[in-house]
């Protein structure tokens, strides 16, 4: 690949993509390289966001189970883990695509792959 950039950010986590966007906003031709295949880092892809999504769904399940304490009777409530996981995955996808959109909007070139230095001026 022979594309030339004034700045290249290796890593598309919260530090990397924000840095890449800011560099582009300052007028530098910028690229961002992320090995995971989706932007946002650990928190967005496999940490905070997926965990909070599942915790929220679990809380909703708990609330529905205890509605009768407030005078609302419902039938049997069951967990469908497959649907819960799909809901969690959808939330993650929406947010990672949002980060990808921000890179495009700010004219940052996004590469899926591993970035390493070949020389002082070449990645």
Q: How should each PLM-predicted stretch be described?
A:
Residues 10, 33-34:
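The conserved SAM/SAH-binding core of class I Rossmann-like methyltransferase domains
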């Amino acid at each position: 690949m022979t594309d030339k950039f004034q700045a290249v950010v290796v890593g598309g986590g919260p530090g990397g993509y924000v840095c890449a966007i800011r560099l582009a906003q300052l007028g530098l031709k910028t690229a961002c390289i992320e090995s995971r295949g989706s932007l946002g880092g650990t928190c967005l892809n496999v940490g905070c966001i997926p965990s909070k999504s599942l915790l929220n769904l679990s809380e909703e399940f708990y609330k529905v189970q205890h509605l009768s304490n407030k005078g609302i009777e419902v039938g049997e409530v069951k967990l469908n883990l497959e649907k819960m996981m799909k809901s969690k995955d959808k939330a993650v996808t929406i947010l990672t695509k949002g980060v990808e959109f921000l890179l495009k909007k700010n004219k940052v070139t996004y590469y899926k792959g591993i970035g390493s230095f070949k020389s002082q001026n070449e990645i």
